Amino acid sequence: MNQGTVLVTGGAKRIGKAISLKLSSDGFSIAIHYNKSSKDAFELVEIIRSNGGVADAFEADLNNSEEVSKLIPKIHSTMGNISGIVNNASLFSFDDLLSISDDSWNEHMNINAKSPILLIRDLYNLNDGKNQASVVNILDQKIVNPNPDYLSYTASKFTLLGLTDTLARSLAPKLRINAVAPGHTIASPEQSDSGFSKSQSETPLGTGPSPEDIADSVSYLMQAKSVTGQIIFVDSGERFLSRKRDVVFETES
């Protein structure tokens, strides 16, 4: 049974791809957002369609508010009723207190926090109140276990955390707003394979989360009709580890 269309931002690769595939298997039509990953996006569209699902791909630069504002109307006109959004797309570039710049701060905030606000607003305005819609924001375990590295990124995730609670209160009953906070799931560009393995093995559970683990939690929240304003940590307990620096740097020594 088709459960309506879900927009997955950054839905073509990595964790976003796992989320898109899982929600498709749940019966949702998938609107795969991409910016520069057009090849990956349309390949995933074909994979979903070959498995009997419904999918299409939509381009937008989430650092550009004008492009963001066109995304929900375009998906609605192409794919019909939108029953949810997964705000998965995220910029993760290094800065700290000494290296932070206006460009870094603004780009992180635009992509990681402002674009989710605009998409949620457009979904709320589109929703006629007859069918409750669901939003899942992808956060980070850093929201309870911060360190000085990736300062703009971390601040943007704290902003999205606050929005999750605020909007869950104010947009009910038309929209449910929840979040998933992953741990270190995929190796960073600066990280070696051995460093990534070390970072996952050092968690309290002795292994790290997989993209599919994240997708399973998103799937639950997308369909849990009585749940709003909640955060699920999918981090193998990483948030209990106190680190002076980001895990990428601590596991490379």
PLM segments and residue spans:
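Substrate-binding pocket helix/loop in short-chain dehydrogenase/reductase
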Residues: D96-L97, S101-N106, S199
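Catalytic loop of short-chain dehydrogenase/reductase
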Residues: Q132-T159, T164-A172, H184-T185
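Conserved NAD(P)H cofactor-binding loop of Rossmann-fold oxidoreductase domains
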Residues: N88-S93, G237
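Conserved glycine-rich cofactor-binding loop
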Residues: A12-R14
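Conserved glycine-rich Rossmann-like NAD(P)H-binding loop of the short-chain dehydrogenase/reductase
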Residues: F28-E43
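C-terminal substrate-recognition "lid" of short-chain dehydrogenase/reductases
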Residues: P211-V234, R239-F240
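Conserved Rossmann-fold SDR core element
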Residues: L23, L161, L171-T185, V227-V234
